[in-house]
A protein has these predicted regions:
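Short carbohydrate-recognition loop motifs
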Residues: 79-99
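Extracellular ligand-binding interfaces
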Residues: 93-195, 216-218
Length: 774
């Protein structure tokens, strides 16, 4: 093995950013700070730089850290180091920095390496979420960087494989845009799909391990860090191709042309032969202990109400189906025909000539659209653009003119055979209306927003605006919502998705920063008036402000002082005291606003769909105050959890409320797509194992009543409107099931009720938590 040497330089945090990298028609999220060095810092020394010409054949692993590596090879950032007898280094996080961790600094050419492997342990009693960010020489976050995340359970040791993107020829890479992942495994975050300075592993200068500050002072250990060479047989020739050879890169089925993989569709005959193969497979595999709703026929007979409901049975939260059978919602999102839609405007040269990109009056016109619904990245704000639906066109090629009817029928047969029992969010109405498989419904709120707010998917709807409730009423009066409200196969309603709750107090601050007519702002001022009295003088004393009267506060947008000023010892004591009071008031009204949001929705759902469960808002970015309000009003609280497991999840503040996972997934790069999604794995086998581990962990968690995989089919190789192009389907772009994943889905799905029976009660689980914390 080659050993690495380092040149040390001190880095200090300058800023931190919350980076959405989600998905759903959206996303989960990753945290990635910016690190900057002081102006008087010396330039980095290029120690142990490799070049291809100097690289021996075969390439040896490159050791960054092991038992022989001195601790001064690590640059700490608000952590304390301790060398263990094993040679591993234990890092204990401080509480001062937002991003405690440590860095390896130097200069390396990792062009012949495919991944870093870090052996990490968590000796503590709480799960921890670690991140690894790699910077190239020109890095200025988010440009020139790539970030990976790892959740590690208490007492667990993992070998964390951090994939290194391939080094695609620069002039070819320059023509690739509007894609989160690019050929060779090049990845970008949600805010820089088209980074001006892409990450280049040939110019690596920093490897940064860190955690987001959580106030716990977590401990974690690093035993080894090694760069793994790319096997000669896996080195991809297309990485060196010029544009004129590389393009077009997408075949008639929407697949990447320049690689082969097991299951790739190479002809129409292969596409159509899949029908008979799968029909035989589905007929041979059927779970035996399910009723028409997917409820457990071998379980207890409970009260049958004709609708889905929640009940705690033997100390474990359960869903109960309309016939009174125990039900655990094992589902998949986006069951439909549009997962493979991709924009084609300005990218026509990506596609083979036999992909019809413009309408000509023929049958493929149905798969060509003019869209204008991109909310971020390349196509946002550009007006209308052309798109092509590879999923639907492949179904047409596979089934013929009645492709939609046959594909809908196949979806129901697949889900039952695979051991799934729920059609998740954003699925086709034609499939849900068939009343063959339970489903969840979803509605949104189109009312005016809090103008001072912001968010990846848009501003936050103002729950104090009269239109808030009226907008929801109109959504629930729509044809399908009315159908779902009376349909026994409808489990319940999600309202909204991954809206931006911000930090505690943030929406109250946003209200103050809004115009004078903002209803949320006026409600906050009324709340302050009730606390401080009719005379604004008391507020001025508490907040350190000089408002002439309450109308003056309302008249102009007001930027409340940042909460962190309260803890800034460089500030005057009076300023800090005032900032602390402002923060407390903003937190208090934030809770009022959250309760207004959830209570108005609950009241409207009880009015329009009284038989259905309120399944919450599908939290992705959130905070304890928002969750506390949701737990008060939702029948089931929903989260989009992109993690490796959810067995360690607990409701906030010990509130005993059932929860459901609205999204999770895993992906790999061995089936022709360019991005793994938010749960990266090394291979299809590893992906299947990750799926099974996740679902088992949920089944054994007494609060979790279901999980929904995101999503039914792969995204387009060239990306949807926001650039997501993830290998996250249960089926590929040609409607071929991923055999390894489906085997795992069946294995855990067929056994899920038996596994659920092993879950400890909530009380017993909490007692075990307390014992473990001693």
């Amino acid at each position: 093995m080659q050993r690495n040497s380092f040149s040390r330089r001190r880095y200090f945090p300058l800023a931190a950013f919350l980076v959405a990298a989600s998905t759903t028609p959206t996303l989960g999220f990753a945290l990635s700070p910016t690190f900057a060095e002081p102006a008087n810092s010396t330039q980095i020394a290029a120690t142990n730089v490799q070049t291809r010409a100097e690289t021996p054949t075969p390439v040896a692993p490159l050791v960054f850290f092991d038992a022989l590596t001195p601790l001064d090879a690590l640059t700490p950032q608000d952590v304390k180091f301790r060398r263990l007898d094993s040679g591993a280094v234990e890092a204990t996080n401080g509480l001062a920095d937002n991003w405690p961790g440590f860095h390896f600094l130097g200069a390396w050419n990792l062009g012949d390496y495919s991944a870093l492997e870090a052996k990490i342990s968590n000796p503590g009693a709480e799960p921890i979420q670690l991140y690894c960010r790699l910077d190239c020489a020109a890095a200025e976050f988010p440009e020139g960087t790539t970030t990976a995340g790892l959740q590690i359970a208490p007492g667990e040791t993992q070998v964390w494989r951090i994939e290194l993107p391939g080094s695609l020829r620069l002039e070819t890479r320059a023509k690739l845009f509007a894609m989160r992942g690019k050929p060779g495994g090049i990845k970008t975050d949600a805010y820089s799909v088209d980074a001006k300075i892409p990450f280049d592993k040939k110019e690596l200068v920093a490897i940064r391990f860190f955690e987001n500050q959580n106030g716990r002072g977590d401990r974690w250990t690093l035993e080894s860090l090694v760069a793994v060479p790319t096997p000669a047989e896996k080195r991809e020739a297309f990485l060196d191709w010029a544009p004129e050879k590389f393009f077009p890169m997408i075949d008639r089925f929407g697949q990447f042309k320049h690689k082969d993989w097991p299951g790739k569709t190479r002809s129409l005959d292969e596409l159509r032969a899949q029908i008979e193969i799968e029909d035989a497979d589905l007929a041979a595999n059927q779970p035996s202990d399910r009723n028409e709703f997917g409820g457990w026929t071998k379980g207890p007979q409970l009260e049958a109400t004709g609708s889905f409901r929640t009940e705690k049975v033997d100390g474990v939260w359960r869903l109960v189906d309309p016939k009174g059978r125990l039900f655990w919602s094992n589902g998949v999102d986006c069951v439909g025909h549009w997962n493979g839609v991709t924009p084609t405007t300005d990218r026509e040269f990506y596609f083979d000539a036999d992909v019809q990109l413009r309408r000509d009056g023929g049958p493929f016109d149905a798969f060509i659209n003019r869209d204008n619904n991109a909310v971020n990245n390349y196509y946002a704000g550009r007006g209308e653009f052309w798109s092509y639906n590879f999923t639907a066109s492949n179904l047409y090629l596979k089934f013929g003119a009645d492709w939609q009817k046959k594909a809908d029928d196949l979806a129901h047969r697949r889900l039952r055979s695979w051991g799934l029992n729920t059609i998740g969010n954003w699925s086709a109405e034609s499939i849900e209306r068939a009343q063959r498989t339970p489903y969840v419904a979803t509605v949104g709120i189109g009312s005016p927003k809090i103008e001072g707010s912001s968010g990846y998917w848009g501003k936050f709807a103002d729950p104090f605006h009269p239109e808030f409730k009226e907008s929801l009423r109109r959504s629930l009066d729509a044809s399908f919502a009315r159908f779902a409200a009376e349909d026994p196969f409808c489990v319940g309603f999600f309202v909204d998705n991954e809206i931006s709750w911000g930090d505690a107090g943030s929406l109250a601050r946003a209200a103050l920063a809004s115009p004078s007519t903002q209803p949320a702002k006026l409600a906050f001022i009324d709340w302050l008036r009730a606390k401080y009295g009719a005379d604004v003088a008391a507020l001025n004393v508490a907040w350190g402000t000089t408002f002439a009267d309450w109308n003056a506060l309302a008249a102009e947008p007001f930027e409340a002082p940042a909460a962190k000023i309260a803890d800034d010892e460089t500030q005057d004591a009076a300023v800090r005291t005032a900032a602390k009071t402002v923060a407390a008031d903003c937190d208090a009204f934030y809770s009022v606003l959250c309760e207004k949001y959830f209570s108005e929705i609950l009241a409207t759902l009880r009015e329009k769909a009284p038989k259905k469960l309120y399944l919450g808002c599908r939290f992705a970015w959130t905070n304890p105050l928002a969750i506390a309000a949701a737990q008060k009003y939702c029948d089931v609280v929903s989260y989009n959890f992109y993690k490796t497991e959810v067995g360690s999840f607990r409701p906030v503040d010990g509130v005993d409320k059932p929860c459901i996972v609205g999204e999770f997934h895993f992906g790999a790069l061995d089936r022709g797509l360019f991005h793994t999604g938010l749960g990266p794995t090394e291979s299809q086998d590893a992906r299947a194992a990750a799926y099974e581990n996740y679902v088992r962990s949920a089944l054994l968690n007494p609060w979790i009543v279901g999980v929904h995989w995101f999503q039914y089919g792969d995204q387009a190789t060239t990306g949807r409107f926001d650039g997501e192009n993830y290998q996250i389907g249960l089926v590929d772009i040609c409607d071929v099931p991923y055999a390894e994943t489906i085997e795992a889905v069946r294995r855990v799905g067929y056994a899920m009720y038996d596994i659920r029976s092993e879950a400890k009660s909530t009380d017993e689980t909490l007692r075990a938590d307390r014992e473990a914390a001693k």
